[in-house]
Design a protein with these regions (language model features):
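Short, charged/polar micro-motifs that form catalytic or ligand-binding hotspots
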Residues: 6, 18, 95, 99
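N-terminal interaction modules that seed assembly of large macromolecular complexes
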Residues: 7-74
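Surface-exposed polar/charged interaction patches
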Residues: 23, 38, 70, 74, ...
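Residue-level signal for alpha-helical context at structural boundaries
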Residues: 34, 38, 46-50, 64, ...
Length: 190
């Protein structure tokens, strides 16, 4: 006799949405309050989404700083690229403004390069992550105001120059991206 094993369906957003449809306004507010109390990441998401408590980027920048420039003398002295990328991803889900995304990509690169030059930290995976964030910053340039572009370009060229000290072809790769995105800039010849 063959036994039949019934597969249990994994819950999805559709299931949650169906349950939420039965909530009244007070019930939804209480649910959000419970989520808010449950996790700091939920608090950060809601603060960012509703622009509560000052600069929503500041908390995400602090997380990037903590992940990419750890206290090398402390207990948690490992560089955590995944945590830094997660901070950017969470900002994107909460707000996702192009200007903010650009700022966080630049922050990631600047903090990582500072750590690398201060402590001689290196590794192909580390620099690949820096390059990918640098590339995302370059790609965002065309989607922001000229004023923001100019500031971002200054910072990107500074990063390219700092990369000349780290090897792994990082400076060349960054330079190629900048020359392609901004071909008439005299800094491409540096």
């Amino acid at each position: 006799m063959a036994s039949t094993i019934k597969k249990v369906k994994k819950p999805s957003w559709v299931d949650v949405k169906a349950k939420l449809a039965n909530f009244d306004n007070a019930g939804l507010i209480q649910l959000v309050a419970d989520l808010y109390a449950a996790e700091k990441v939920n608090q950060a998401f809601l603060h960012a989404r509703f622009s509560i408590g000052g600069d929503p980027l500041e908390m995400y920048k602090k997380r990037i700083q903590k992940a990419l420039f750890p206290n090398v003398m402390g207990r948690n002295s490992d560089v955590k690229i995944t945590d830094a990328k997660k901070a950017i991803s969470e900002y994107q889900k909460a707000i996702g403004l192009t200007e903010g995304m650009l700022e966080l990509h630049l922050c990631f690169c600047e903090v990582a390069m500072d750590f690398s030059t201060d402590y001689g930290y290196e590794g192909e995976g580390f620099f690949n992550a820096v390059y990918l964030q640098f590339k995302k910053a370059v790609e965002a340039l065309g989607k922001v105001s000229v004023e923001i572009q100019e500031d971002a370009l200054d910072r990107l060229y500074d990063l390219r120059n700092i990369a000349s000290n780290v090897g792994y072809g990082v400076e060349d790769d960054m330079g190629d991206l900048l020359a392609e995105a901004n071909p008439d800039d005299e800094r491409n010849c540096d």
